[in-house]
Amino acid sequence: MDLLVPPSRDNSVVTFRLDTIGAGLVFADSLGKLTAALKSQGDGGTVVVQAPPGTGKTTLVPPLLANLVGERRRGQPRVVVTQPRRVAARSAARRLASLDGSRLGSRVGYTVRGESKSGSDTMVEFVTPGILLRRLLVDPGLEGTQAVILDEVHERGLETDLLVGMLAEVRELRGDLTLVAMSATLDAARFAALLGRSADGGAPAPVVDCPSALHALEVQWVPAAGQRLDDRGVAYSFLNHVAETTVAAHEEALMVNPDVDALVFLPGVREVSDVASRLRGRVQAGVEVLELHGQIGPDAQDRAVSGREPGDTPRIIVSTALAESSLTVPGVRLVIDSGLSREPRRDAGRGMSGLVTVSCSKASAEQRAGRAARQGPGRVVRCYDQQAFAAAPAHQTPEISVADLTSAALVLACWGAPGGRGLALPDAPPRAAMDDAVEVLRELGAVTVEGTVTDLGRTLAKVPADPRLARALLDGSTLVGRRLAAETVALVAGDQRAVGADLTKLLAAVRSGSHPAARRFAEDVKRMESLARQETSNTVDRQRIDSQRALDVSAREAPGFVVALAFPDRIARRVPGQGTPTYLLTSGTRAGLPAGSALAGHDWLAVAEVSRTQGRDAAGTGAVIRSAAPLSAELAAAAAPELLVEEVTARFAQGRVTARLERRLGALVLSMTPVRPSAEQGRHAVATALEKAGLSMIGWSAAADALRRRMALLYRELGDPWPDVSESALLARLDDWLAPELESMATGAPATTIDLADPLRRLLPWPEASALDSLVPERLQVPSGSRVRIEYPEVSDGSGGPDRTNMEPDGGSPVVAVKLQECFGWDRTPRLIEGRVPVLFHLLSPAGRPLAVTADLASFWSGPYSQVRAEMRGRYPKHPWPEDPWTALATSKTKNRM
């Protein structure tokens, strides 16, 4: 039987003509293997399809499944196909409907956010992953759907990963549901193992591999002279290099084949617009430059991905990763690759998430290159060198590993798998990121303490936006009106870029209808208004709303207020005294504004998006505000009452405890008033200062330091009962020796009035304390009669009890610095602590300069003294330098005064 031509059957459903649809498509040769793999599993089944981009899998597999399902159930089939992007879903549906010869929206249709062309007779429906996720939450059994195809699973989008796990569970309840995962890269075995867990006793799902359809592909390396990235992001010099390389390569290609179109890959919308603008000023007359990214309108997107007739105007299509794998752009024989891509990143420490520019993976680079050789020989020009390619990761980072998981956590809670527990996901979500996401949901009231979903959580999950925005839609509808709340949420949830980060200007543009996204925005607003109308009365926080109802929020202030309701941790106030506008957020994060932003004149902002960057716009903060709306101080406080606190803050500074009454909104100090601290507040301030600065916050007087050194030597040599007076030991037993002084400071006494010598004596053991002066005297009487101060060793932290290892002349011994002449006749070195510790003598010249260091006076007199005498007697003739120091009179005087 010819698999491309379905058998005639006596039913009303007209099947797809696969022979017509598959004409010229490489994957047509693999339909037999796919059919056999599915039929071998009976009703339903799971299969993984592995085929490079451009082979026709997205065009052929859906109608094949529709035919097989229709044949099996003798009725109209329904096959749902996910595409990672809206433009890809529309393009795939349009192409299949065209090949089928049917009207788009009848047998073949699509549904994306804000737009649907499908009906009851639709057999193949292309949708974005988010659409299917929300359908699953409403209808976990997917009644009326016989097959699901997850396309481009290799991209590892967060929503697609969730669908892999959730649909595997659906198949455990619905054995008749056919599930196919399609990948463009060599990672099929991973998904085969996951999807096979729920089928055939856990055996991997069969893999249908389609060989590459590449024609000859020339790879050219044209690296830029400088770096691709600088502290502002993608370097302008590199963008200029990409533009110049594109013009040169396309002109060269047109000389050989006038029908060659070029496809240029850049990481983001800004770079696409920049390079497209440069190209328009440099290309030959008659060459059209088109942009392809998520912020242009659907018509412009569709025009860019549509082919052209031979002889029509040659095109250069400048695209984000949108055209990497989920779209085939007809006519492309030349690819210019920047080698860069954007990936989500989450900064838990600063409460930020966003996109960062990184080198694309090897898999992405190969897919981009392959776009040039799908329909004939092609060429890829890589604007980087082979070393950079070799250093690139093999695959792009799974989004679940690096993205904000708040929306995903809500989906999982609604599914009955809080935190993803028990769900067979390609990669488990990071524990810390998931815990943070669940905590956000708890604060919203979307989940319980245990993590199970609440009624409010199920309502928030219906809104196609971040749960925080969904909650702001419901609360904001009551406070500012459904229309204004819906407009703000639709704008922030969309992917339109706010020039200068100014959301109010962007809102005015989409309202006017002149913006490319105006039509989709209007649809989103309409849908969100409807959701707000249905759900507000049952789910709003009445107590909170009643406290805010008295606010007079103007239409101009409404966007900022709604954003602040959604993201109270991102309410920001300008930091005074900064040349470049810098804002402090309630979360404690600092961020800059894009240069020239009209928002710079506002003291308060409600920030919808803030991301990491090291560019000029960050103003040295490491972050930049990407979208925000003005806010007043009053509305800021009203939007985040849970962050508003009045607190007395006491601190120990400049030697005493001071306090002030602070009124704060998160990290933002609204007002400060000096107050008298309570005793408890003072104690806390003193304890905090001690924890940070130790006893140096009080200071050691000379007397206290000397006593502490003597006590430390006793502890080192004798141990208990002599106390350990190291810093850590003293801090550990403050109540035993310093409690009265600490209480005095806590109630306002300055530290300068406290001498630690007397408190230290409280630690001396009794009756041993009476022997302190004899064991470790303050002074030592020398033969001249002088009483010379003994310099005891500095106290080391954690001295640890008896230890004789630190007795060398390196700072571990007690030292007496005395003039040499005062020690004549001293034949034995004095020892302290009952003879345990020798005194180290620093013998000085008459001018007080060191002549010798010794712990053995007898050896010094017998040896080195004669050399010292020979050198010094001429320099100091007025002082005695006897030949026999043993019998000479010790003196502190000159010879004339003796």
Language-model segments: residues:
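P-loop NTPase motor module signature
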Residues: M1-A472, Q534-Q548, V795-D797, R804
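Acidic, serine/threonine- and proline-rich low-complexity intrinsically disordered segments
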Residues: D2-V5, R483-T582, S587, D603-R779, ...
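Generic recognition of stable, solvent-exposed alpha-helical segments in well-folded globular domains
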Residues: K33, G56, L60, V87, ...
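Long, charged, glycine-rich C-terminal linkers/tails
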Residues: S106-V112, V562, P581, R787-R789
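Conserved helicase core region in the C-terminal RecA-like lobe
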Residues: G130-I131, I317-L322, G339, L565-A566, ...
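Short conserved micro-motifs at the rims of enzyme active sites and ligand-binding pockets
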Residues: L137-V138, L229-D230, D347, A392-H395, ...
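Amphipathic alpha-helical packing elements
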Residues: T582-T586, R590-L593, A693-W700, L772-G800, ...
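Short, surface-exposed, low-complexity cationic segments
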Residues: G596-A618, E794-L832, V837-V839, L843
